[in-house]
Amino acid sequence: MKIYLNYLVKVLITSPCSASVIIQYGIKSWPIWECEPSKFQWNYDDKEICLIIEGQAKISTQNGYIYVIKAGDLVEFPAGLNFEWEITKSIKKHYRLGG
């Protein structure tokens, strides 16, 4: 398991997310969001935790950091940050906002 943490933007990626974490947090019961390949800006008003089920995306921060997230990754985005999403392969994720 690899964990990537950037202290400037506080994005946490756990790759791959373990089955025990998925069960512990009830991730499979979270809502699902899907998107076809595209590029768009997104502002996180609330913290988001998501599990990428399918696909891949490149996420760029305002200060130039680029992350590639893919199926199996658990990603935590802090509130208050702006990102550019570039969906490179149709993506599907479970997500939870807040807390």
State what each model feature region is.
Residues 79-99:
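Ligand-binding loop in jelly-roll beta-barrel domains
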Residues 23, 40-44, 61, 67-68, ...:
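Short histidine-centered beta-strand/loop micro-motifs
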Residues 44-59:
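Short, conserved beta-strand element in jelly-roll/cupin
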Residues 63-79:
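Short acidic-glycine-tyrosine-enriched beta hairpin
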Residues 3-24:
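Transition segment at domain starts
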Residues 42, 59, 93-96:
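Short hydrophobic/aromatic-rich beta-strand segments that constitute the beta-sheet cores
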Residues 16-18, 26-45, 78-79:
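Conserved short histidine dyad/triad with adjacent acidic residue
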Residues 3-10, 29-31, 92-99:
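Double-stranded beta-helix
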